[in-house]
């Protein structure tokens, strides 16, 4: 009998609840500000829409959603791979360090965004010191993923694990490329030490930004959530996954198509016409793997 260790999963679950409440409360405040613009000025500059919106989007995406994803990983991975974190003191230490650095990063993000310290790139507002922290704990999560896979007893990788791996690889690539920036003080000796400018400019900056912005949604709100559903839905419903082959087909379809669809954020802009067309076409094609996963889940519930 394997004795699983859920301490890290519980810590991330606590963070999910905390950041979810904070992020969604700010979202409600923003909704009221849109209806009643005078509410923008009740707390001075710190209560304006422009200060609160990055807090809401980052809080929900990278606070609430990522916490839940990490909690799911540290719970699901042990069970489907038939291995406990207790069996590896190294992986346990990595998991705990992952949580601590992650939590510190989110708290620092709240402070800096409230202060108006931002790169001004949507969903990538965090400045370069925090970007470095994000990279560190993302690498720690990667060590956890491949470390647990490396010591597993169950040789077959369940579909949920595939989705977690794709999330790690895709977000790592997207985040690194989009957040390539030059700290202005280190480069010129002038200005604030925390300020930076993007390594890209003009149309190129827009292309990289929305390649990231679109796929941050794909690989934070889609693939890991599907991973959670493919574990908990059969578990709670008592039904087998309707079609395991369909889950694999939808997985590869989603990975191939989603990465090309970011161009639909730049319609009628200065990016090349062929890229706008490709982004639009791939967005329509995306119906197939998306519905493939959705139909598989619905038929699983039907039994």
Labelled PLM ranges:
Residues 1-11:
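Cytosolic juxtamembrane amphipathic/interface segments immediately preceding
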Residues 3, 41-44, 199-202:
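Short hydrophobic/aromatic segments of transmembrane alpha-helices and their interfaces
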Residues 10-42, 46-83, 88-116, 128-149, ...:
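Hydrophobic cores of alpha-helical transmembrane segments in multi-pass integral membrane proteins
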Residues 118-121:
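Membrane-helix boundary connector in multi-pass membrane proteins
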Residues 124:
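Acidic/His metal-coordination segments adjacent to aromatic residues that form catalytic metal sites
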Residues 177-197, 205:
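Conserved, charged catalytic cores of large soluble enzymes
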Residues 187-190, 198-199, 266-278:
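Extracellular/periplasmic helix-loop-helix junctions in multi-pass membrane proteins
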